[in-house]
Amino acid sequence: MAIELHDLKPAPGAHKAKTRVGRGEGSKGKTAGRGTKGTGARKNVPEFFAGGQMPIHMQAPKLGGFHNPFRTEYQVVNLDKVEALFPKGGKITVDDLVSVGAVRDNELVKVLGTGELTVKVDLVVDAWSKSAQEKIEKAGGSVTKR
């Protein structure tokens, strides 16, 4: 005998009817599982209420400070990394740094002066530190803004 579409029914216990409270003395009637008297019996208690103990939002410290929404953030590249990635030197742009995986695309790049530079590099970046500029110029190179 083949199963027809109208013969299908859910497994026993798959669809359990929800308890309808407050619908007569025999089944969770009268107080409907809320107990007698008090806030919980009369109205709903806020979800964040912790039973009279110190609320969680008051346990957390009051952090001060200021977050500047207009701060410009740079991806940094140090001179030792520039020399490691470009041992022959030459002209280096942000696109070159992106292609070797030193920085991400479409973001500002700043060169910092950690490490030594022995090759001549002509960097085209968004920003640089004073120490980086001194070391680059000492090695015979230059830094220009893109």
From Swiss-Prot:
Part of the 50S ribosomal subunit. Signal peptide: none annotated. Belongs to the universal ribosomal protein uL15 family. One of its GO terms (molecular function) is structural constituent of ribosome. This is Large ribosomal subunit protein uL15. InterPro entries: Ribosomal_uL15 (IPR030878), Ribosomal_uL15/eL18 (IPR021131), Ribosomal_uL15/eL18_sf (IPR036227), Ribosomal_uL15_bac-type (IPR005749). It comes from Cutibacterium acnes (strain DSM 16379 / KPA171202) (Propionibacterium acnes). Keywords: Ribonucleoprotein, Ribosomal protein, RNA-binding, rRNA-binding. Binds to the 23S rRNA. HAMAP family: Ribosomal_uL15 (MF_01341). Residues 29-43 have a biased composition (Low complexity). GO terms for biological process: translation. The lineage of its organism: Bacteria, Bacillati, Actinomycetota, Actinomycetes, Propionibacteriales. Pfam families: Ribosomal_L27A (PF00828). GO terms for cellular component: cytosolic large ribosomal subunit. Residues 1-46 are annotated as: Disordered.
